[in-house]
């Protein structure tokens, strides 16, 4: 009897030690993608940073840091049921802060994409912005929303709310812009991003997400074998500095992606637009603009069988094929070296340089109005 009691006590002591190291301190459990929350605990510009983990009922997982509102990882099953990380990024806050312009997974604003010559005129007043890309303003400048700390509140296991007050004059933009972004990991394995914003002075707004996707599940691979479809009859051609010059049909050009094509098939075609972009880096004008229920784009990896569908209520979609990813390689999560064209971005948006091109849909937001936008990245297999 004494031996039995002793055995039970020993077992209880052993179980009570689970989750602790040799010194008795609680050990940290990694996320599905191998991230450690402690690697994101810091302070930037005097504000705390952290990693937030979203999980749905099917076992999928998405991780977001409030520095830049960045989507750090998305774990979804491949055709064999293996959980696979489909976005690029870093595994600690220090790397993100050291490399802000890579924009991995970042929220982008106040104006996503380019504004020509870093200036625009609104209601008779000219506003000068940072010129951080060939004399133009790209993604709100070097200190855009991708490089600030957002206030974060985890609503439930599947939902994260981020808020940020972009002050009047920040990066040259007029008006105090009060922004709310909701990340939700739905039970059908979709990352649903909803944006809201209000202003106290007329301004321009174009918010988006700059996640880099590679669906293959092969660390360090390119996306040249992925297939892509974009439901768009027209697109914005650009000049040598990637400023739109108008609207043209995709028919008869390598920009025709209305039926699925292999990304690498025409990416190095001497077609002038692909030469200017160094590959695909253009805005497609969506046929179902404003309809969140229609598939705007579809990407498939033949290796993993993972499918990503994009839904949005925005009129445009920027397809960027990782042309500027360094050929020398960037070391990302778990030490993986990211190659040239190691991922693609699908950024839902209004057209680039709209503040200077009155024929494009308006991006002006005035007091009393509410800016709303939504982007859904939905994952499945085939």
Regions found by a protein language model. Give the residues of each.
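C-terminal motif of bacterial Sec signal peptides marking the signal peptidase cleavage site
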Residues: 13-16
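Sec-dependent signal peptide hydrophobic core
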Residues: 5-10
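An exposed, glycine/acidic-rich loop-and-rim segment of catalytic or binding clefts
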Residues: 18-60, 66-382
């Amino acid at each position: 009897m004494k031996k039995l009691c002793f055995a039970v006590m020993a077992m209880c002591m052993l179980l009570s030690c689970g989750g602790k190291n040799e010194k008795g301190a609680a050990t940290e459990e990694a996320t599905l993608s191998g991230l450690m929350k402690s690697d994101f605990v810091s302070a930037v510009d005097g504000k705390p940073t952290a990693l937030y983990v979203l999980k749905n009922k099917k076992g999928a997982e998405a991780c977001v840091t409030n520095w830049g509102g960045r989507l750090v990882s998305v774990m979804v099953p491949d055709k064999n049921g293996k959980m696979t990380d489909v976005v690029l990024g870093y595994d600690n806050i220090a790397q993100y802060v050291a490399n802000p312009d890579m924009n991995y997974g970042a929220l982008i604003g106040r104006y996503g994409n380019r504004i020509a010559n870093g200036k625009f005129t609104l209601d008779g007043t000219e506003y000068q912005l940072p010129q951080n890309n060939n004399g133009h303003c790209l993604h709100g400048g070097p200190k855009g929303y991708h490089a600030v700390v957002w206030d974060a509140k985890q609503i439930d296991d599947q939902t994260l709310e981020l808020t940020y007050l972009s002050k009047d004059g920040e990066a040259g933009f007029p008006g105090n812009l009060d922004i709310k972004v909701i990340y939700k990991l739905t039970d059908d394995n979709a990352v649903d991003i909803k944006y809201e914003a209000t202003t106290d002075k007329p301004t321009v707004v174009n918010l988006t997400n700059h996640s880099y996707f590679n669906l293959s599940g092969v660390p360090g691979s390119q996306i040249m074998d992925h297939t892509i479809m974009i439901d768009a009859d027209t697109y914005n051609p650009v000049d040598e500095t990637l400023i739109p010059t108008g609207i043209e049909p995709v028919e008869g050009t390598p920009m025709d992606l209305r039926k699925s094509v292999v990304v690498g098939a025409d990416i190095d075609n001497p077609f002038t637009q692909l030469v200017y972009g160094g590959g695909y880096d253009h805005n497609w004008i969506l046929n179902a603009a404003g309809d969140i229920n229609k598939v705007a784009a579809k990407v498939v990896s033949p290796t993993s069988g993972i499918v990503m569908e994009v839904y949005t209520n925005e009129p445009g979609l920027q397809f960027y094929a990782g042309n500027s990813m360094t050929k020398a390689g960037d070391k990302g999560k778990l030490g993986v070296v990211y190659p040239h064209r190691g991922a693609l971005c699908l950024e839902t948006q209004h057209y680039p340089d709209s503040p200077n091109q009155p024929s494009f849909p308006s991006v002006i937001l005035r007091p009393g109005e509410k800016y709303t936008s939504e982007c859904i990245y939905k994952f499945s297999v085939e």
